Swiss-Prot record:
Positions of modified residues (Phosphothreonine): T193
Listed name of the protein: Sphingosine kinase 1
Organism expressing this protein natively: Rattus norvegicus
Phenotype for G82D: Loss of sphingosine kinase activity
Topological type in the membrane: Peripheral membrane protein
DAGKc domain span: 12-159
Region Disordered, residue ranges: 363-383
Localization per Swiss-Prot or TrEMBL: Cytoplasm; Nucleus; Cell membrane; Endosome membrane
């Protein structure tokens, strides 16, 4: 529990951190890197820690469900984005989820997908770096102890599943690359480059209905009771079996190359997907690419994305919209969804963003600017 005299938006000194580390993530060097790179910096900064190694998929989820969180000032996750996904969903499954999700989180890149860490590195004002340089930068952010509130995305599927995302949901090209590049995990993040070119060689079209609630029309809210669930109220969503509300935008095209919902700036350490910058409180980026785009243009887009210049190409097939909610209904079960890099069965899904819903170690204690007073304020103190 944070001392009463600790400034708002800061971790205390000394600080106690539970580190969850996946020793098999990425190239399998996370534990060695923690001992050689991370540990000395934490000890110098008076950050005491307990290291717990995950042994299987969803182990981190089980650990945070059962952990006595009051023993720790923060939870650090050293792996890829998938382990942070497990931790956040584990916190939201606890009986005390409302207080548990306020426990500050820290992303230490140690997997093959480190987009969240890359985004936090960008928010701190650092240049785009990868591998050990990114790990050191993120460790130093933890040593500096500054916190920022971040958005959370809640998702609801046709089969009744409810889950949460801290980074992204993708369907089509990006999700397929996530799935098909698993066999190249030992290559680290370069697996995504390899997977991208394999998928370009056999480009697929995905059919479905996409609808969204743009930021400018978000004033009209649905009664919270219309979508009953545990967790934060979904004030913009109606049940999936009902049509979307009339003030939503329904995309007329139904053939896509990809659909991407992104809460942060980076899709990987070298994919600066949202150069328009950090989302405001209660806003997320929706990107989609319509069918008809050439392979040559896709190559240009992905190469330009490394520097955040893809929007400068003015590709007529690429659309970006700031949104607060969305619904995606695939016409068939072809393909998969990827949520924070974790695979999810292909079925109708909808979601909405919850502003300033969790604390993360970042380079600034400033919160994203808000659009209106409807957003949830960050907690008075992280716990």
């Amino acid at each position: 529990m944070q001392p009463a005299d600790c400034p708002r938006g800061l971790l205390p000194r000394p600080c106690r951190v539970l580190v969850l580390l996946n020793p098999r993530g990425g190239k399998g060097k996370a534990l060695k890197l923690f001992q050689s790179r991370v540990r000395p910096l934490l000890e110098e900064a008076e950050v005491s820690f307990k290291l717990m190694l995950t042994e299987r998929q969803n182990h981190a989820r089980e650990l945070v469900c059962a952990e006595e969180l009051g023993h720790w000032d923060a939870l650090a996750v050293m792996s890829g984005d998938g382990l942070m996904h497990e931790v956040v969903n584990g916190l939201m499954e606890r009986p005390d989820w409302e207080s548990a999700i306020q426990k500050p989180l820290c992303s230490l890149p140690g997997g093959s997908g480190n987009a969240l860490a890359a985004s936090l590195n960008y928010y701190a004002g650092h240049e785009q770096v990868t591998n050990e340089d990114l790990l050191i930068n993120c460790t130093l952010l933890l040593c500096c102890r500054q916190l920022s509130p971040m958005n959370l995305l809640s998702l609801h599927t046709a089969s009744g599943r409810q889950l949460y995302s801290v980074l992204s949901l993708s369907w089509g090209f990006v999700a397929d690359v996530d799935l098909e590049s698993e066999k190249y995990r030992s290559l680290g993040e370069i697996r995504f480059t390899v997977g991208t070119f394999f998928r370009l060689a056999s480009l697929r079209i995905y059919q479905g209905q996409l609808a969204y609630l743009p930021v400018g029309k978000a004033a009209s809210k649905i009664p919270a009771s219309s979508l009953a669930q545990k967790g934060p109220a979904n004030t913009y969503l109606v049940p999936l079996e009902e049509p979307v509300p009339p003030h939503w935008t329904v995309v007329p095209e139904q053939d896509f190359v990809l659909v991407l919902v992104l809460l942060h700036t980076h899709l990987s350490t070298e994919m600066f997907a949202a150069p328009m910058g950090r989302c405001e409180a209660g806003v997320m980026h929706l990107f989609y690419i319509r069918a008809g785009v050439s392979r040559a243009m896709l190559v240009r887009l992905f190469l330009a994305m490394q520097k955040g210049k893809h929007m400068d190409l003015d590709c007529p097939y690429l659309v970006h919209v700031p949104v607060v909610a969305f619904r995606l209904e695939p016409r068939n079960q072809r393909g998969v969804f990827s949520v924070d890099g974790e695979l999810m069965v292909c079925e109708a899904v909808q979601g909405q963003v919850h502003p300033n819903y969790l604390w993360m170690v970042s380079g600034s204690s400033d919160s994203p600017s808000g659009r209106d007073s409807q957003r949830r304020p960050p907690p008075e103190e992280p716990i």
